[in-house]
Every structure is written in structure tokens, then in C-alpha cells.
Amino acid sequence: HNTVTVDGADQAEFWSAFRVGRRPKILERSYRGGDVGFELTGSHDGFSHLAGRPVHRRRIDAAPGRVDLRDEVLGGAGQIVESRLLLHPDCEATRSADGFCVRSGPVRVDAVTDAQISVEDAWWCPDIGTKIRTKQLVLTLGRAPVASRVTLRVQP
């Protein structure tokens, strides 16, 4: 999932494709549209079973050619927080001076962040029962409580 983990824990217990337990409660959700972009904000208590009862808050600001993704984990007890961005199998990721460059055909997206970034093997599951090897960007945000940001810039 393209979301955060706290000490490796997901926001819910995923048992299989359609079996989910310990579902998080939505604490905040908002949408604000503009002439050329939008802002989405949401938070949940899916990590409340962990020490310090961390709350995850995400804000997405989208504008032509740019997406800002801001993650905050409020509370917590020093757990390591990571954010994951799954890449399509056709994408190739390479390190750049201030983050990563992701390419697919003629499209280039620069990922600029204050977090530590690595690339890991992952699975892309486009359909039930279908698993395709791919890569994911893993952003180590720091220890809870923590806030971090990644900016995705689309290059023509």
C-alpha cells in the first residue's frame, strides 16, 4: 500500500485480499478544490494499539506538474516511520542529487524529499491472484512523532 508503516505495522490487519481486521477509524478527511489543483487531507487511528497511540495524518497538494505529499505521525513512542510508494513494473528508479528520478517511457518524475530513500523489491497485484515483481520507493521519515514531505515533479 502507498501509505506509512510504524515499526513495520500496517494501519489495519490484512489477512488476505478481502479480509481485514482492526480497521482504523477516520479522524479527519477534507477535500478542497481549486482552479488548477486540489488538496486532500486525512487522518486515522490505525496505529492506536501501539505505544503512544500514534495517529497518521496525510495531506496531498496537487497542481499541474507537481504533487506534494506530507505525512505526519503524531504521538507514538519513538517508533520508526516509513512511507512506501509502489512503482508500476514499467518504471525505473535511479538516485538523483536530492531524491530519486522515476522514468517510464518519455515521462520523468523527480521525487524530492527530506527523508532517507531506498528502493526495495515489491509486488504489484493488478488483479486478484496476479502478482508481478516491481520496485517501491521506501522513505524512512524518522522516529515518531515525525513529519516529512516528498514532492513529485513531472518533467515533460
Regions found by a protein language model. Name each.
Residues 1-156:
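CBM-like, beta-strand-rich accessory domains located in the C-terminal region of large
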